[in-house]
Regions:
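Membrane-embedded alpha-helical bundles of multi-pass transporters/translocases
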Residues: 1-425
Length: 425
């Protein structure tokens, strides 16, 4: 369904089935982990849930570096190491949180309680909440279906690009949304409109503080990042360029993806789960419209006449680069989702913008301009990454990331931003 054409290759189809069987139990473990994390967050215990995702990264690294060579055989057999890594990570993530649950006396055996009014209320609120929070993931899933019709590698390029966005989103966007939800709920229950506005305002500012420079950094450093991390073995310079196209498209929407993680809790804290669903449905439909519209534009611009003569499906299956449309469409639909939520939030009159936004945005803009100037200067001075060795790439990338980050931080401090501004929600 999501990788059409794979079933014509028995070996590849068998490998995918094996990986699916290995990783499917991860869904159970990660769901229980999320439940445990939600319980801990409700008791203001944020550290353990925030650290838990690191376990998956460590297991993936261990699977690729340690387990894969020990499986021996062909690369197709060695890739099963990553499946085992995902399975192990799911179990370890759950076990990692159990001591913290025991510390707050919440580690109990599961039991049925469907008749409890609290459980029934959670079930009523949960379904629309799941959809409203998953629009970006659903869009990406639909994008992979379309990418399967494009040239070979499009799905992988799109998936790898999504990994680069998950770092700032997972570390900062999700973390801010997680921290801010209990505060917003507390202010709403106590009818503290001032406190509600103050907490949401703080979340919005912190999100922009991270997501805007992260977006610009990804746009400028996409190829250096991909070349340094992935361009080895069978991953060629061509794959680097194609993955970078996906990063360009998706990273354009990074501020919207991150702001959604903060704006959605403003609705959930008030137990309003219907409004995010309305916005999500609109974004979902818009994403498909954007996908086909942008594919049509790129088809006319990028596909040569000799390929067009073979028919549309044959042409899009051979012309590389068309997957750029999918990344841009996801970004545009996320901005639409954010815009609708922002409009409806304003109509509820529960949020009043705090003073100082004009000066804050100006400082943010100037700091980003300084960072971009520094990165462009370094990129002009450094040789092409495709021509460097592995260690040269690592050193050059460290210089770029460190130099750009330091320039941004110094510029913000020079314009009056202080570490204490990170507090105050």
């Amino acid at each position: 369904l999501f990788s059409s054409g794979v079933d014509t290759d028995p070996a590849k189809h068998g490998l995918l089935v094996d990986l699916f069987r290995l990783t499917f139990p991860f869904l159970l473990f990660v769901s229980l982990t999320a439940l445990a994390g939600g319980a801990l967050n409700s008791f203001q215990r944020f550290a353990m849930p925030a650290l838990t995702p690191v376990i998956l990264n460590l297991c993936m690294i261990a699977g690729a570096v340690w387990l894969a060579p020990r499986l021996g055989g062909t690369p197709e057999k060695q890739i099963l190491a990553l499946g085992w890594a995902v399975l192990a990570a799911g179990l370890l993530q759950l076990l990692f949180q159990l001591p913290s649950l025991k510390g707050i006396n919440l580690l109990t055996l599961p039991r049925w309680g469907w008749s409890h009014p609290g459980v029934r209320k959670v079930m009523t609120l949960m379904v629309p909440t799941l959809f409203g929070s998953s629009v970006a993931q659903i869009n990406l899933l639909l994008d992979t279906v379309i990418a399967a019709k494009l040239t070979d590698g499009s799905q992988s390029w799109l998936s790898l690009a999504d990994r680069f966005l998950e770092l700032p989103l997972g570390v900062f966007g999700v973390a801010l949304g997680t921290v801010i939800l209990p505060a917003l709920a507390r202010h709403h229950v106590s009818t503290d409109r001032e406190g509600f506005s103050r907490s949401l305002d703080w979340g919005l500012r912190m999100t922009l503080l991270i997501s805007v420079p992260a977006m610009l950094g990804l746009l400028l450093l996409a190829e250096p990042l991909i070349a340094t991390i992935f361009q080895h073995g069978q991953f060629s310079a061509f794959d680097t360029r194609m993955t970078a196209l996906s990063v360009y498209g998706l990273s354009f929407g990074l501020p919207a993806f991150a702001l959604l993680k903060v704006v959605l809790p403003a609705f959930y804290a008030r137990q309003d789960t219907r409004t995010p669903v309305r916005a999500g449905v609109a974004a979902l439909v818009a994403n498909m419209v954007f996908n086909f519209a942008l594919l049509a534009v790129l088809y006319q611009v990028m596909v040569p006449d000799e390929l067009k003569a073979q028919g549309v499906m044959a042409a899009i299956g051979k012309q590389p680069g068309l997957h750029l449309a999918l990344g841009i469409a996801s970004a545009l639909s996320s901005y639409l989702n954010l815009g609708l939520l922002w409009y409806w939030l304003g109509k509820t009159d529960v949020y009043q913008r705090r003073p100082g936004w004009g000066g804050y945005l100006l400082r943010l803009l100037l700091a980003c301009v300084a960072m971009v100037a520094a990165l462009l200067a370094l990129l002009h001075w450094l040789p092409a990454f495709s021509a460097m060795g592995v260690w040269e790439r690592i050193g050059a990338l460290a210089l770029l990331v460190g130099g750009g980050g330091a320039t941004y931080a110094v510029a913000m401090v020079a314009m009056g931003f202080r570490p204490r501004d990170l507090r105050g929600h």
